[in-house]
C-alpha cells in the first residue's frame, strides 16, 4: 500500500511506516502576508489599511496573496460580508478576478453593488468582463453573473444586473441540428450539455421571469413544456430538467395565488396574446386557461382561485347548488334529464327563447348529454335481451325496433366526433384517449350496421345456425356489436370525473392501464420464448387418432403444445390455473422428455406468477399511490377538462337531436354555399376606420389592464417570496459566522475609540502646558534641565494609556480633569495648525502621495477610520512641539535620540492583542527625516505614572530590564531602554 503514497526506497529506516509528504505543495505566505490576511479575516480595518499603505511604499507584501483555501483578501471580505473592507480593498485596486461571482453566490447585495460600480462598463451596457483564473476559479467559463444570480434566485442581485443591461444566451431547440450545436456536441459533449442545463436553470428562475418577462404566465408555460420535452432527450439530466419544469409550474401557480378579486382573475384567464390589435377577439372565452390545459399546467389549473371562477360559471343558473341537500340535487337532475327532449326541441325551434338559452348553460348541457347517453345504454340493454326476436335461424334478419332506435344515437355520436375533430384539429383530437375510445366504438357500430345490411341483402333463407359458416356476416356482426357494447358501457367511466369521490379512482384506473401495457411487453417476450421451446419439444407427440375434441378446451385436455398457437393459449391460461400438469406427459416411455417438459412448464409458471405478476402488482400500486398523493390536483385538472368541453359554444344539442338540422344550421349552410359555390360571390363590406379604431382601442385597453394586473401580481409575489425566505431562514452556521465577524470588528472599533479618546485628552493637556510656558518665559528658563526634558517629551513615546471613557467625557463636559491630564481650551493657533494639517504633512514618510484626481475623489467623500484619526492627531502634536522647540532653541539630539527639528515620527504599534486582557504596550518609533528621508527605529516603553515608578524600581523581579534613562514629565515618568 505504501507505493501509493511515496516512491519506494529500499534504504528506508522504517519499513513499517508510511512517510507522508505534501505532493502538491504551494508557495508559503510570509508572516506579513499572514498577518494581513488574518486582519482581513478578523475585520481589523486599521491594520488592513496600514498593511495596504505599507505595501504601496515598501512592497513588503503582495496584496493579492492567496491563503491555503485559495482565497484572496477580497474574497475573505466578501465571505465575511464586510463592506467597509471590500470598499477599502477596491480603493487600493486589488485583483478582482471572479469576486463578483463569489459575491453573487454568497448573496451579498452590497458587495455586488460595489463590484459593479468598481469598473464602469464601457461600450455596451454590460457588466465588466470577469477575469477568471483557470487554476483557482470555482466557476466554469459558461457561468456569467446573471446566470449565477438566477441560480441563487436573489431578486435584488438580478435587478442590479438587469439594470446594467446584461443578457442571457438563447438556448436552441431540443432537437436542434444546426452547425453550432453539432460542432459543440462533438468537441465536448459534456460541456455542451452542462452549459445548456445552466442556461435553462437560469431561465427557470422565478425572480428572473418575474423581473424580465412581459407575460410571466406564458413564459412559465412554454418553458415548463420545453423542459419536460428536453428531459426525454437528455436522459442523463432527466431529473434536473423535470425539477426545473416543476419549478416553472409552481411559479405560475404561486403568481396566480396573488390575485385578490374576480376582476383580476378574469383579466388573467381571458387574456389572449396571439391576436393583433385590429383583430376581433372574444373577451370571455378563458383563452389563458385553455393554454394552461394544453401545456398541462396542473398546478395552475387546480389553483383554488381558478377553480372558484370555473365553479361559478359551471353552476351559472344554480348559485346555491352546492349548499342544497343531496336528495334535492338528485331530484333536480332527474327532472332535467327527463325533460331533455323538450329542451332540445325548444332550442331547435327558437334558440333565443328562455328554454333555448337555458339548455346552453354548461351544467344543464352536461345533464342533458348524460341523460341522452344513459338512454342509449338502456336501448343497448334491451337489444341484448332479444325481446322481439323470434326467427333466430334467419341468416339475414331485418333490424328490430330497438335497433332502429339505436341507429340515430350512433349517427349522432359519429356526427359529434366529426364536429369535434373539425373544431379542435386532428392533433388535439388524438391526444385525448377518450376520443380514441369513441373512434373505436363508432367504428365497431358502423361495421356492425354494414355487415347486417350485407347479410340482409345476400341471405334471406332460414337455415339452422349450427350449419352457418364461421365467417358468416351475421355472426361477425353480432360479435362486433357485442364488443361495441362493452366499449359503450366503459365509456360511462369518463363521467365519473365530475364526482369528487369517483374522479380520483377513474384517474388511477387510467394510469394503471399504462402499467399493464408496459407489463405486456415483457410478458409477451417470456410467453413467446417458452411457447417456442415447448412447441419444439412436444411437436413430435401430437395425437390425432380417436379424439372427438382436440385442444385444451376439451373435457380432457390434450395436444396442449402441439402447435404454436395452442402452446400460447395453454401458457396464457396456465396463469389462472386452468391447465393440468398431465398435459406434459407423452404416451411413449420417454421419461427424460416428460421431465424436461414439466421443468420448462414449471419454470414458466414461476417466472410469470411469482416474478412478473408481482411486478405488475407493484407497478399498479405505485401508480395508484402517485395519484393518491396528488389526488386533488389530478382530479381538478381532469374535471376542468370536462367542464371546458361544455363551455364551448358548439355541441349544445345532445344525441340524437344533433343530427336534426336546425334553422340556424340551415342558414349557415345556405350562406356558405352562396359564398363559396355560387359564381357571384358576396363581396365583403369593408370596415370603416371608426370600427377598426374602436376594436383596436378595446384590444389595447385589455392589454393595458392585463399589464397593470401583472405588475401588481409581481409586486405581491416578490414581497411574499422575501417574507417567506426570512421566515424559513432560521439560525444557520452562516449566521453564527456573521455574528462572530461583527463581534470581532466591533472589538477592534472599540479598542480604537478608547485609544483615540485617551490620546486626544493628553494632546489637550500638552497644549495647555505649552500655552502657560509661553506666558511665563522667564520662569521656564530658570527651571533648568529637568523642565527641558519635560518640554522635549514627544507623543510618539506613548503606546496606550487606558483612561475610562466616561471620565474623559465627564472632564470634557464639566471642564474638570480626572487626574490624568489637564483639559483646557485649545488656542486658535492650534486649531489653525490642525486645519492646515494636510499641507504640513505632505512630505511625511509613511503617508502615500496621491494624484490630484484621486485626492479630489477622496476629498469629495472622506471617510476616516479610528486608526487614521489617531495617527493624524499624533503627527499634529509632534509638529506642534517641534515648532516650539525650534523657536526657543531648545531642541537637542543627544543620547536620548529625541526627534529633532528635521525629523517626524510615527508610532508603530506592535502590541499583542488579547480578547481577555489588555497587556503591556511595547512600540517602535519610526522617524523620517525631511532631508535624507532615512528611517530610524528606536525602542520605546510605556509612560509610567510617577507614583508607581518608585515601586517598579524596587520590583525588578517583575520586569527584567537593562539600565534605563528616566525622564520626568509632570505626573508621568518616561523610561527609555
UniProtKB/Swiss-Prot annotation:
Biased composition, class Basic and acidic residues, residue ranges: 776-787
Region annotated PDZ-binding domain, chain positions: 975-977
Residues in compartment: Extracellular: 384-403, 454-475, 535-599
Region (Disordered), start-end ranges: 767-790
Gene3D superfamilies xrefs: Ankyrin repeat-containing domain
Modified residues (Phosphotyrosine): 959, 972
Region (Interaction with ITPR1, ITPR2 and ITPR3): 615-977
Record's keyword terms, sorted: ANK repeat, Calcium, Calcium channel, Calcium transport, Cell membrane, Coiled coil, Disulfide bond, Ion channel, Ion transport, Membrane, Metal-binding, Phosphoprotein, Repeat, Transmembrane, Transmembrane helix, Transport, Zinc
This protein's record includes keyword Ion transport: yes
PROSITE patterns per the UniProt record, alphabetical: ANK_REP_REGION, ANK_REPEAT
Pfam family membership, one: Ank
Annotated positions binding Ca(2+): 417, 420, 435, 438
Quaternary assembly: Homotetramer. Heterotetramer with TRPC1 and/or TRPC5. Forms a heteromeric ion channel with TRPC1, with a 1:3 TRPC1:TRPC4 stoichiometry. Interacts with TRPC4AP. Isoform alpha but not isoform beta interacts with ITPR1, ITPR2 and ITPR3. Interacts with NHERF1. Interacts with MX1 and RNF24. Interacts (via CIRB domain) with SESTD1 (via the spectrin 1 repeat) and SPTBN5 (via C-terminus). Interacts with CDH5 and CTNNB1. Interacts (via protein 4.1-binding domain) with EPB41L2. Interacts with PLSCR1.
Protein name: Short transient receptor potential channel 4
Gene name as annotated: Trpc4
Amino acid at each position: 500500500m505504501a507505493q501509493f503514497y511515496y516512491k519506494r526506497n529500499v534504504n528506508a529506516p522504517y519499513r513499517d511506516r508510511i512517510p507522508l509528504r505534501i505532493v502538491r505543495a504551494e508557495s508559503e505566505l510570509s508572516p506579513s502576508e499572514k498577518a494581513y490576511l488574518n486582519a482581513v479575516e478578523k475585520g481589523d480595518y486599521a491594520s488592513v489599511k496600514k498593511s495596504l499603505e505599507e505595501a504601496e511604499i515598501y512592497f513588503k507584501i503582495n496584496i493579492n496573496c492567496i491563503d491555503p483555501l485559495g482565497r484572496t483578501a477580497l474574497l475573505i471580505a466578501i465571505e465575511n460580508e464586510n463592506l467597509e473592507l471590500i470598499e477599502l480593498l477596491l480603493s487600493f485596486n486589488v485583483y478582482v478576478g471572479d469576486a463578483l461571482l463569489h459575491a453573487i453566490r454568497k448573496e451579498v447585495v452590497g458587495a455586488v453593488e460595489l463590484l459593479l460600480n468598481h469598473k464602469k462598463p464601457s461600450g455596451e451596457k454590460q457588466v465588466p468582463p470577469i477575469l477568471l483564473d483557470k487554476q483557482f476559479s470555482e466557476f466554469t467559463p459558461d457561468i456569467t453573473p446573471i446566470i449565477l444570480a438566477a441560480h441563487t434566485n436573489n431578486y435584488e442581485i438580478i435587478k442590479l444586473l438587469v439594470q446594467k443591461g446584461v443578457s442571457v444566451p438563447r438556448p436552441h431547440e431540443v432537437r436542434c441540428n444546426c452547425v453550432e450545436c453539432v460542432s459543440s456536441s462533438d468537441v465536448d459533449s459534456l460541456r455542451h450539455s452542462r452549459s445548456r442545463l445552466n442556461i435553462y436553470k437560469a431561465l427557470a428562475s422565478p425572480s428572473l421571469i418575474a423581473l424580465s418577462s412581459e407575460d410571466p404566465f406564458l413564459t412559465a408555460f412554454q418553458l415548463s413544456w420545453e423542459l419536460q420535452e428536453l428531459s426525454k432527450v437528455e436522459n442523463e439530466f432527466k431529473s434536473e430538467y423535470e425539477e426545473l419544469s416543476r419549478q416553472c409550474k409552481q411559479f405560475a401557480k404561486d403568481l396566480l395565488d396573488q390575485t385578490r378579486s374576480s376582476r383580476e382573475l378574469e383579466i388573467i384567464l381571458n387574456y389572449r396574446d396571439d391576436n393583433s390589435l385590429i383583430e376581433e377577439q372574444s373577451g370571455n372565452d378563458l383563452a389563458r386557461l385553455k393554454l394552461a390545459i394544453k401545456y398541462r399546467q396542473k398546478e395552475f389549473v387546480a389553483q383554488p382561485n381558478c377553480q372558484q371562477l370555473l365553479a361559478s360559471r359551471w353552476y351559472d343558473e344554480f348559485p346555491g347548488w352546492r349548499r342544497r341537500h343531496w336528495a334535492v340535487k338528485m331530484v333536480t337532475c332527474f327532472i332535467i334529464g327527463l325533460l331533455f327532449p323538450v329542451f332540445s326541441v325548444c332550442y331547435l325551434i327558437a334558440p333565443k327563447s328562455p328554454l333555448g338559452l337555458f339548455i346552453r348553460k354548461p351544467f344543464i348541457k352536461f345533464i342533458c348529454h348524460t341523460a341522452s347517453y344513459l338512454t342509449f345504454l338502456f336501448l343497448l340493454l334491451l337489444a341484448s335481451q332479444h325481446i322481439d326476436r323470434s326467427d333466430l335461424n334467419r341468416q339475414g334478419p331485418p333490424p328490430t325496433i330497438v335497433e332502429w332506435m339505436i341507429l340515430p344515437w350512433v349517427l349522432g355520436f359519429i356526427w359529434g366526433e366529426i364536429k369535434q375533430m373539425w373544431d379542435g384539429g386532428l392533433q388535439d383530437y388524438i391526444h385525448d384517449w377518450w376520443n380514441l375510445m369513441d373512434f373505436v366504438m363508432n367504428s365497431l357500430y358502423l361495421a356492425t350496421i354494414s355487415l347486417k345490411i350485407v347479410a340482409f341483402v345476400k341471405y334471406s333463407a332460414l337455415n339452422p345456425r349450427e350449419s352457418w359458416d364461421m365467417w358468416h356476416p351475421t355472426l361477425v356482426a353480432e360479435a362486433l356489436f357485442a364488443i361495441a357494447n362493452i366499449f359503450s358501457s366503459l365509456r360511462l367511466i369518463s363521467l365519473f370525473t365530475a364526482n369528487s369521490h369517483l374522479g380520483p379512482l377513474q384517474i388511477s384506473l387510467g394510469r394503471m392501464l399504462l402499467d399493464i401495457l408496459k407489463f405486456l411487453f415483457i410478458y409477451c417476450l417470456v410467453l413467446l420464448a417458452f411457447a417456442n421451446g415447448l412447441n419444439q419439444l412436444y411437436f413430435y407427440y401430437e395425437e390425432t387418432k380417436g379424439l372427438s375434441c382436440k385442444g385444451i378446451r376439451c373435457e380432457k385436455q390434450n395436444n396442449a403444445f402441439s402447435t404454436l398457437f395452442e402452446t400460447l393459449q395453454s401458457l396464457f391460461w396456465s396463469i389462472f390455473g386452468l391447465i393440468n400438469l398431465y398435459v406434459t406427459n407423452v404416451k411413449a416411455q420417454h421419461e427424460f422428455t416428460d421431465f424436461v417438459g414439466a421443468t420448462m412448464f414449471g419454470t414458466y409458471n414461476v417466472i410469470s406468477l411469482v416474478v412478473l405478476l408481482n411486478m405488475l402488482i407493484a407497478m399498479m400500486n405505485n401508480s395508484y399511490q402517485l395519484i393518491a398523493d396528488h389526488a386533488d390536483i389530478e382530479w381538478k385538472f381532469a374535471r376542468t377538462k370536462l367542464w371546458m368541453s361544455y363551455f364551448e359554444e358548439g355541441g349544445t344539442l345532445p344525441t340524437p337531436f344533433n343530427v336534426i338540422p336546425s334553422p340556424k344550421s340551415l342558414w349557415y349552410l345556405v350562406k356558405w354555399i352562396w359564398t363559396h359555390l355560387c359564381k357571384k360571390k358576396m363581396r365583403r363590406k369593408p370596415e370603416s376606420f371608426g370600427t377598426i379604431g374602436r376594436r383596436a382601442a378595446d384590444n389595447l385597453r385589455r392589454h393595458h389592464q392585463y399589464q397593470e394586473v401583472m405588475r401588481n401580481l409581481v409586486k405581491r409575489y416578490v414581497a411574499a417570496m422575501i417574507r417567506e425566505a426570512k421566515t424559513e431562514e432560521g439560525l444557520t452556521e452562516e449566521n453564527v459566522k456573521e455574528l462572530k465577524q461583527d463581534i470581532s470588528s466591533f472589538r477592534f472599533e472599540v479598542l480604537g475609540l478608547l485609544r483615540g479618546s485617551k490620546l486626544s485628552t493628553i494632546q489637550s493637556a500638552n497644549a495647555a502646558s505649552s500655552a502657560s510656558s509661553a506666558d511665563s518665559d522667564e520662569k521656564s528658563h530658570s527651571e533648568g534641565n529637568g523642565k527641558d526634558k519635560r518640554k522635549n517629551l514627544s507623543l510618539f513615546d506613548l503606546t496606550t494609556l487606558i483612561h475610562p471613557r466616561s471620565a474623559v467625557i465627564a472632564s470634557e463636559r464639566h471642564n474638570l480633569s480626572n487626574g490624568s491630564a489637564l483639559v483646557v481650551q485649545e488656542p486658535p493657533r492650534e486649531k489653525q495648525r490642525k486645519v492646515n494639517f494636510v499641507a504640513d504633512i505632505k512630505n511625511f514618510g509613511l503617508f502615500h502621495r496621491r494624484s490630484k484626481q484621486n485626492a479630489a475623489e477622496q476629498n469629495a467623500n472622506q471617510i476616516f477610520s479610528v486608526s487614521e484619526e489617531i495617527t493624524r492627531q499624533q503627527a499634529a502634536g509632534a509638529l506642534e512641539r517641534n515648532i516650539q522647540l525650534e523657536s526657543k532653541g531648545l531642541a537637542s539630539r543627544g543620547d536620548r535620540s529625541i526627534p529633532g527639528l528635521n525629523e517626524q515620527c510615527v508610532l508603530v504599534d506592535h502590541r499583542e492583542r488579547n480578547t481577555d486582557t489588555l497587556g503591556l504596550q511595547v512600540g517602535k518609533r519610526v522617524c523620517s527625516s525631511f532631508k535624507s528621508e532615512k528611517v530610524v527605529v528606536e525602542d520605546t516603553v510605556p509612560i509610567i505614572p510617577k507614583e508607581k515608578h518608585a515601586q517598579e524600581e524596587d520590583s525588578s523581579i517583575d520586569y527584567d530590564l537593562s539600565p534605563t534613562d528616566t525622564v520626568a514629565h509632570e505626573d508621568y515618568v518616561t523610561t527609555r531602554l
